[in-house]
Amino acid sequence: MLFRSGATGTGKTVTLQVLAEGFSRIGVPVFLADVKGDLAGLSQPIAPHPKIDERCVKIGIEDFKPGGWPVVFWDLFGNLGHPFRTTITELGPLLLATLLELNDTQTGILYSAFRIADDNEMLLLDLKDLRSMLTWMGDKAKDQKSEYGNLTGASIAAIQRRLQVVEEQKAEHFFGEPAASIEDLLKTDFSGNGVISIMDVTKL
């Protein structure tokens, strides 16, 4: 991991762009989080400028030809790029429990929800699916006790409240289909250049 800091105008963005271009050139896929919205230019060749010509002469570069790089844009909200999503099922109970900051008892209930979904060949795609599952578990708690343990109403209600918190933070945009995978971020183009994946996080 590289940490680049400095005052405004010291070249932080340019440093990041140069590194991304270098990695892409040698076939290494790159993932960038675009905080300010100024990295999209990697996809386009730079416009001619006297300062660029002056720099090329100074460092001995001949026949400089600017070019764009293979870029894929991602956006959690799907406005400025492909929507970046996953499903509740793919996230799994352990990571979801951590996200929701559940205690051990509540985490156990969440594991039971995933187990019930697996046993019944049900997919938990988004937060609505998980809410429906928890509601069903609360209604059928007595019938399921022998197989899945004590599904207490208080713990189920606590999980529902934690879901409300993450929904207020717009987390529902992150869950759903089509689900992105790590392979989507590890691609090269037909020329062997690493694809630069740029995630727009200006609204996060």
Where do the PLM segments sit?
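The Walker A (P-loop) glycine that initiates the GxxxxGKT/S ATP-binding motif of P-loop NTPases
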Residues: 6
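Hydrophobic positions on the alpha1 helix immediately C-terminal to the Walker A/P-loop
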Residues: 15, 19
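Walker A (P-loop) phosphate-binding loop of P-loop NTPases
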Residues: 9
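Conserved lysine of the Walker
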Residues: 12
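Short, small-residue-biased leader/transition segments that mark boundaries at the very start
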Residues: 1-2
